[in-house]
From Swiss-Prot:
It comes from Trichormus variabilis (strain ATCC 29413 / PCC 7937). The keyword Cell division does not apply. It is a single-pass membrane protein. The 4 large subunits of the cytochrome b6-f complex are cytochrome b6, subunit IV (17 kDa polypeptide, PetD), cytochrome f and the Rieske protein, while the 4 small subunits are PetG, PetL, PetM and PetN. The complex functions as a dimer. Belongs to the PetG family. This is Cytochrome b6-f complex subunit 5. Pfam families: PetG. Its main location: membrane. GO terms for molecular function: electron transporter, transferring electrons within cytochrome b6/f complex of photosystem II activity. SUPFAM superfamilies: PetG subunit of the cytochrome b6f complex. The chain crosses the membrane at residues 5-25. Component of the cytochrome b6-f complex, which mediates electron transfer between photosystem II (PSII) and photosystem I (PSI), cyclic electron flow around PSI, and state transitions. PetG is required for either the stability or assembly of the cytochrome b6-f complex. One of its GO terms (cellular component) is cytochrome b6f complex. Keywords: Electron transport, Membrane, Photosynthesis, Thylakoid, Transmembrane, Transmembrane helix, Transport. The lineage of its organism: Bacteria, Bacillati, Cyanobacteriota, Cyanophyceae, Nostocales.
Length: 37
């Protein structure tokens, strides 16, 4: 039986990681030359 705390931490990390990736991709799409790249 999976502990609720462990599963919560894993889900939290996944959500934060996906959110960070989408946010970075969105920034690069909106402003491709903002960071010189």
């Amino acid at each position: 039986m999976v502990e609720p705390l462990l599963s919560g931490i894993v889900l939290g990390l996944i959500v934060v990681t996906l959110s960070g990736l989408f946010y970075a991709a969105y920034k690069q799409y909106k402003r491709p030359n903002e960071l010189g790249g």
